[in-house]
A protein has these predicted regions:
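ER/Golgi luminal nucleotide-sugar-dependent glycosyltransferases, focusing on the catalytic module
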Residues: 1-201
Length: 201
């Protein structure tokens, strides 16, 4: 799954995928338990008014506070939806490449487990856990490798939740790793865009 700010950065993606046709490339950071702050993503039924997409908005500080409370066992706005399956929760990243068999499994699972789908309705950033949890509780969990997407997140409070713009300084890091795609590109760093476009022509 990609977006308009992603680019191919190396030739041979299709050939590489053919050579690993049964592998799902996805970043799985860790299993999430109720002792993790990240469990607030699904344990809280997040009020929609708190979902303001502004990194310095007061509501972001409220979200952070609620997450730390959740880690200590205090769950405000508890998610009272239930799901029947006994699943382990996992968190990772949004971008992944999966074989058709895995995608079919995900679609079939969601269709058969509407309660699991509904469980995430008022969650926070569910794209970081929804697919990861399904895959890691499936027979396909044994055939997983790290994502093929280069992403660098910011290090400041304002940027830590977002990929930062790729510049010429990232070129060496991208080429040194097993990356076929990269995110995110912006026109103000056109040199990096031109470099990779010319490279994969």
């Amino acid at each position: 799954l990609g977006s308009g700010q992603d680019l191919l950065v190396k030739k041979g993606l299709y050939e590489y995928l053919d050579s690993k046709h049964n592998i799902t490339f996805i970043r799985i950071n860790k299993r999430i338990t109720e002792n993790d702050r990240e469990s607030a993503r699904y344990r809280i039924s997040w009020p929609k008014k708190l979902m303001v997409r502004n990194d310095m908005h007061f509501y972001r500080f409220i979200r952070i506070f609620l997450q730390f409370l959740c880690k200590t066992g205090i769950v405000l706005f508890k998610n009272n939806r239930v799901y029947k399956d006994s699943l382990l929760f996992y968190e990772g990243r949004t971008w992944f490449i999966a074989p058709i068999a895995v995608m079919d499994y995900i679609v079939e699972y969601v269709n058969k487990h509407v309660d699991f789908y509904d469980y995430w309705e008022d969650s926070l950033a569910s794209d970081l856990m929804f697919f990861q949890t399904i895959i890691m509780n499936s027979p396909f969990r044994e055939k997983i490798e790290d994502e093929l997407m280069y992403v660098k997140f910011g290090k400041t409070f304002k940027t830590m939740n977002h990929p930062v713009t790729i510049t010429n300084k990232d070129v060496c890091l991208i080429e040194a790793g097993n990356f076929f795609c990269a995110r995110k590109f912006e026109l103000e760093e056109k040199e990096a865009i031109d470099y990779f476009i010319n490279k994969i022509k």
